Structures are given as structure tokens and as C-alpha cells.
Amino acid sequence: RDYYASRGLGDVYKRQGNDNLGSSLHGSYDAFGTHVMFNENSVKYIPYYLKSQDYPDVTWEKTVMKNIGLDFSLLNDRVNGSFDYFWNDITDMLGYANSNGLSMFGSYPINGAHIRRYGWDATLNTVNVTTKDFKWTSVLTLSHTNAIWKERMPNHTYNEYQIRKDEPVNARYYYRTNGLVNLDKSNMPSYQPEAYQKPGCPIIVDLNGDGLITVEDVDMKNVIPSLYWGFGNTFTYKNWDLDVFIYSQLGVDKYNDVYSWTSGRGLGNQTNNMSVYIKDVWHSELNPNGTIPGIAYEMASVSLPGGAGTDIGYENSSFVRVRNITLGYNFKPNQLGALSKLLSGIRVYVDVQNPFTFTGYTGLDPEVNTGGNYKGGKAEYPQTRTFSLGAKLSF
């Protein structure tokens, strides 16, 4: 019996350049909008000015793309798949630096940074069951990707708490919180920052346990999901077929912007409808067990060492979503009667998109992003659940 059918191993190396600053790297002159007349207005002089400088030492960005992959097939092709690992190095990245005083131009282009993007993709296709009337096949896909700074621009200014080596490009820095200061402050730790010592303020976590709140207590998360996966299944029984596809993103947080509509200080002058989250805002008399900071706390008006924010409003937005379920029936020619003269087959089906989502995220949708920032939302509209009924005619 042939348990091992085939395998293939390959690698790819590719290099390319990129000039994303356009014509700003090349010197040019342009005419002023006015001219000067000499010799009793008989001679016209058009003055020109230096519009942009030449920068002969500035080069294109360079991207080196490397990839290695493996394709395999087992059990007489009942199991086959692939695995690809890639890493791309982007060097001599283009940017701008401020010019010295009295310069004709406020900034000038430079090379300097280095980003590494890396990750892997895996696919597994299987034929699980095959009989005379029934067949079940599956496809599983897994993917992971990340991007880190190998080198920053020479003019980059680090915050005190920033990681200097291999910092994720999409890093988010924040102070962890652990509940709210109660009315008598009996649960407030001794190291609580002064600006956060009023009842209803979030309790800041001393991450390194030294009894102080400093930049050493700033935590970091990568806003790129740690894993994407999808799982599709197709079942066929005689003339019937059923397709179910599930996909997921894991290991990612997202800001639930509805929290910004629960500002305690904004309640007094709001005339529009408020979020139901307002019921969770801390209040010394009406809601002493509230979980959202009260009127004494306004994130924009108080700061922590280094200027990092907190995790207030951020939630784990990992999810598993049933993307679609499709059930169909195929009419063969011998079932069409008189229609068989015109048609070779008819398929009728019902389909539902986004019927189920499993997540701990309390906002409207853990995936949709309408706020302009990756994984940040502005009370986004959830993905639509749709139901369809259709037919496909084959002539």
C-alpha cells in the first residue's frame, strides 16, 4: 500500500527596489509667477528659483524576499498539503528628517530603517470518507505573520518604555489595570499614582512588583493576530451537497470605541442617546460596583509615566466565525423530464452568510474595522447576516 506518494521542496529568492518619495529626490527649478521688465519695458526677465534639491546619496528602498516551501501528498493523495515560510527584509527605508535652521527646505529625504516581515502559511487537504453515495472532504488553512523593526530611522525618538530590539511594527504600549478604586479607598495599593487616587479611577498594575509605578510597568502587545485559521468541509450524498466554512483570528485585542461614549464627565452635557455601557459606569451611590471608570477619571486629562495609556476599553477580540453554510441539490438530466431537451442540469441551493460568531468581545463585531486604525473600531456596523435562495441552470 502506498502510504507516501510524493513530496516537493522549493525556495524562492527575490530582490526589488522601491522609490516611494516620488520626484522629491530630484532637483528642479521653477519660474516665479511674476516677471521683471528692463530697458523701458522692452526686455522681460523671468526669475527662477530652486524648487527642490538633488539628493545623490539617497537610494531606493530595497526589499529582499525569501521563501521556502514544502508540498506533500500521502495515502494515495487522500492527504495532501503545503507549508511555506517567508521572511522579507526591507532596508534603506525612505523617510524625512528635519533640516537645519535657515535651510531653504524644512525637511530632506534620508535612508535608514530596516523592517523584517516574516511568517508561515500551511494548507492541509483531506479526503476523509469516500463510499458509493457519500463523500466528505476538508481543507484546513493556518497562517501567522509578523513584522519587527531591526533598525529604526536615525532620527527616531524613542519613548522611554519602547523596546529597542526587534520591536513589533504594530506594537501597542499600555499600563494594565485591575479594577477601580472603591469609595473608601480600601482596595487602593500604596503605589497608586496620585492622579489616579480618586474613587472610581482604575487601579494601575505594578507589573514588575517593585512597589512603584514607572515606565518599567508598561506592557506591550502586538496588534496583529497571532494566528489565522480556516476550516472548510464539503459533504456530498447522492444529489445533495453541503458546504460549511469556518474561520478565525486568535490572539488579538481591539479597542471597543463604545467605551468612549461612557465618559463620566460627558454625561452632564449629553442630549443624545448613550450606550447601554453607561449602566456599568462607577458611581459612589448609584453604582458602587461599576466596572467602567467614573466621573473622577478622564483618560485625556491625566497621564502616567512615559505618557503610555491604559488597557481601559481594550478587549480580547479573538473569534471563531461560521462564514457560510450552503445546502444544494443537483437535478440530473433523467430527473428533468421535458426540460432535459434544454438543460443538462439544475442545481438549487440555500445559503446563509455569517450565521454564527463565537467571541468574548462585547462590541458589535470583533473583526470589522471602520475607525482608521488597525483593529480599532468606531462603533462599527457588524457584518451582515444574509440568507439566499438560488438556482443554477446548465445548458
Residue spans of the language-model regions?
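Glycine-rich, aromatic-lined ligand/substrate-binding cores of catalytic
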Residues: 223-256
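Active-site-adjacent bridging/hinge elements
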Residues: 40-47, 94-98, 204-210, 294-304
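Extracytoplasmic gating/loop element in the C-terminal half of outer-membrane beta-barrel translocons
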Residues: 249-347
